[in-house]
């Protein structure tokens, strides 16, 4: 009966394509809400156009057309002057999920997954049933007009119609109809998105034609930014799974050459160093649960305990000192008992660093006796977890330097030359094997050893900032502020080896800030790799970093000020909070390197703003005083004229000049 039920259940078992998954979960692609869905469409098509133009070395000219066809029904067209798309790639670009030119590259880019354009087609198809119309040419004299639909079950694009005509034009135009969308020029729609992306791409010209008219976001820089270089993964950001993935894809014939060619900061010299680390870990792995491991620990433990005996001699008895020294002489047989004393001294050291002299004296008698169960004693003092951590740290320090560790255990006769040679051969065999034969345990050991070594931070050639000067030009063009200050911080790393950089700017006065019921208030513009983040502001670490600043210190009334704060995070990997990619995960406790960089940059800009506001207030105060004095200049001149017996007008003229 049970077997029959199992057969029945699995009759409904089916495989599903990634396109089918997103058809049922379109909100994960940003298609949730009428305005947000239309903004997502514009975002995907515009960023694709920008990326194509920049990769081809072309200054982007982008046209966006939004036409209302009916209630919640719009036609959208995005046209660029980019390199065009070869005919054979059109079905893959627009009709296949997870197909693209970015996901496999370790480089800063606006998008990576290869979902965006295909997601636009999928949304058009499930809301109107209509294909996307693609007009494109690579400049070879042939202009293709193609209609593409998606076979959702197969996750493949299909050309349903094709026309070819001759003409001199190069670029791509995408047209589509969409329902369940809405448009306005509010702060969370396509207009605001284009307004902000024009700030982050000052070298692009974007023309928007919508139901309200035409708006031109002109370029303010006539030079393309330098292309970011593709980077290699850094050892500190490497995982076992990633190393095995690299091993499957590499063209290298040996693991050692793969590490040099595929990873950043790994050289042939560092491979020799890696051999010692792997040798250390292999020895420890083989003997960690044996008497050998206890003997290894004892080599170092006796030195530590001697230092503790001298340090805490006022808190332990002479008999205890003698007992400990006898135990050391009788190693390794007495190691288990000696460990109990070692744990006591580690705990004492921890307490001495934490407690006051008075509290230590109260515990003095407690120190002078060894309880039956020392861990129980520590637990009563709420220190068991900390004590174990301290002990683990000491064990790690014991084997921190692999060369010293190997030399020490060899000198003490804990390992023979034959045994050591056997381990060395095993390490060399791992590094000399074909990468495709690498096992999980071997890859895990390599990753752990690499992350125990010291490496320079990864190169930052894969990052491409907008540049402080360009940000200031864009903000001046868009907001006409009274004051603007931008800064691009030097690149740093987070999570051990992922490079990132932060750019921030403050614009004050003019059209800065957002209009509220009681005047202009602070406006926060968030960007990730130059792409505007319009939604989920309260959940975003960039917002939290801005709000953590005490703006009153810089002469503002908190957030009730006409100020626009610009924050752009650039990285080869942006730590988004979710698949929607609208909020960045960073705070005081998570990816704090990013959070702190934003704060530091904002404080630098804030100090410049404070100087500006102080000068303005000082000038205003001086002007007020001058006007006050000028008010009485005539009276003063009349009195002085009587004394000097000179014309009043002549005296007044000189007084005014003096005041000016």
UniProtKB/Swiss-Prot annotation:
Keyword Metal-binding carried by entry: no
Classification via Gene3D superfamilies: 1.10.8.50, 3.30.230.10, Histidine kinase-like ATPase, C-terminal domain
Alphabetized UniProt keyword annotations: ATP-binding, DNA-binding, Isomerase, Nucleotide-binding, Topoisomerase
Protein EC: 5.6.2.2
Domain of life: Archaea
One Gene Ontology cellular component annotation held by this UniProt entry: small ribosomal subunit
Signal peptide segment: none
Recorded GO MF terms: ATP binding; DNA binding; DNA topoisomerase type II (double strand cut, ATP-hydrolyzing) activity
CDD domains membership: HATPase_TopVIB-like, TopoIIB_Trans
A family per Pfam: HATPase_c
GO biological process: DNA topological change
Catalytic reaction equation(s): ATP-dependent breakage, passage and rejoining of double-stranded DNA
Chain sites annotated for binding ATP: 48, 80, 101-102, 111-118, 581
Coiled-coil boundaries: none
Family in the record: Belongs to the TOP6B family.
Oligomer status and interactors: Homodimer. Heterotetramer of two Top6A and two Top6B chains.
Function: Relaxes both positive and negative superturns and exhibits a strong decatenase activity.
Protein name: Type 2 DNA topoisomerase 6 subunit B
Organism from which the protein derives: Methanocaldococcus jannaschii (strain ATCC 43067 / DSM 2661 / JAL-1 / JCM 10045 / NBRC 100440)
Gene name per UniProt: top6B
